[in-house]
From Swiss-Prot:
Belongs to the methylthiotransferase family. RimO subfamily. Catalyzes the methylthiolation of an aspartic acid residue of ribosomal protein uS12. The keyword Protein biosynthesis does not apply. This is Ribosomal protein uS12 methylthiotransferase RimO. The gene is rimO. PROSITE patterns: MTTASE_N, MTTASE_RADICAL, RADICAL_SAM, TRAM. [4Fe-4S] cluster 2 binds at residues 185, 189, 192. NCBIfam families: 30S ribosomal protein S12 methylthiotransferase RimO, MiaB/RimO family radical SAM methylthiotransferase. Residues 171-403 form the Radical SAM core domain. PANTHER family: RIBOSOMAL PROTEIN S12 METHYLTHIOTRANSFERASE RIMO, RIBOSOMAL PROTEIN US12 METHYLTHIOTRANSFERASE RIMO. Residues 36-150 form the MTTase N-terminal domain. Disulfide bonds: none annotated. Gene3D superfamilies: Methylthiotransferase, N-terminal domain, Nucleic acid-binding proteins, tm_1862 like domain.
Amino acid sequence: MLPILKNQGVKKDQNHIALKNDSCESSSPCFDHEGNKINFISLGCPRNLVDSEVMLGILLKAGYEVAPTLEEADYLVINTCGFLEASRQESMDTVEEVLSQRKKTAKLIVTGCMVQTHSDALKTTFPSIDYLLGSGDVEGILKAVQSTQKGQIISSARSYLEAGEVPRRLSTPKHYAYLKIAEGCRKRCAYCVIPTIKGPLKSKGKEQILKEFNLLLSQGVKEVILIAQDLGDYGKDQGAKKLTALLNLLQSMLEIKQAFWLRLLYLYPDEITDELIALMKSDSRICPYLDMPIQHVNNQILKSMRRATSKEDIIEIITKLRREIPNVAIRTSLIVGFPGETEEQFQELIQFVQDYPLENVGIFKFSREPGSHAYDLPNQISDEMKEDRYHRLMQVQKKVVKKNLKKMIGKKIAVVVEGYHPETELLMIGRHTGQCPDIDGQVLINDGRKVKAFGEIYTVEITDVADYDLVGHVI
């Protein structure tokens, strides 16, 4: 089994990757030569985290070791997020912090989405960065580390998705892992610059995915989370129609006679077909959980956003999911303050959240991204109005989510118990099938005397609600 990586943070929303000191993969030499220790900080989404895990695997295979702390590292790698202004600012803050904490001889490599689109700003603000490596070019990490001069590679042309076999070192707890099945995006939503950053859709081959899936299961992973920019587009760059490639992949995974949870992230409403719903119903190993970004429900706004759906379509698919999979948990994301959004259209969004309560709702203020179609749209909304609408919708969302959670009180559900609460060992934390790691609430366990091992599934009776979390005890 691969050694377990720990997530520690310079800040709480960063993944700071460090290995346990007493473990080393047998195929990688364990040595403690000066100048060979590396440290990763991965920002942003799980897709970025997978890239960091692959880069780390490449370096460990080449004989490098992981430094347990930032200050001990000879090489520091920051995998940035550049999706929104707030994420770019976090990336800049992280670079500044790392530069202030690193030892003088340490080399800093900055990679990821922000490098792809804002490399000039990074070089101008932080001339002491040693190397810039573009998003998706994970195989360039070895060159970046070994280079004796400052350098730059801005290219995502050779993604590891197309490269076949690559090493990877997991940084998640041993019982779950992300599996990226595609990179890039073929859609052109008005507010988004992901196609510019990540390039066009590139699907990973089915056989390679199945090989990785089987490897994860053999390592003891019990929950595999499928990710892509858009799972529903998987295989369409290779000629697949509608959802056929994804359905075929899922069916092949389900042929494996083993217990596991399979979680699907990022499926657009127009891609949730009757066939997918039927497959989810037919095998409980597919978590009754869908991350379905709808962004808005006013048809005029949806059209301006270049979304291939309507309010009527969204209501229809939610209604169908509730009818066919009664215990389904639906996560979505909503944008307030999109150019031209009127108070009446915003109220329509509020009413929708109340009328069609969803289990998890992420709310974002529209970010005016240079290069996006929406950047030049008229009737831009003021920051003050965006902030006001954000807080008003958040208040409604909190009430709706809490009402949904209270319906769970008294139920006995399967929960993977993940460990002690970070603030006290009097509590344990876990998740049920309707909760995805890092983005959703958790189950707080106040009586875990029957828990024999973390990462295992236990039956928990829900007794209370605390904010976005459930409270219960193992029975």
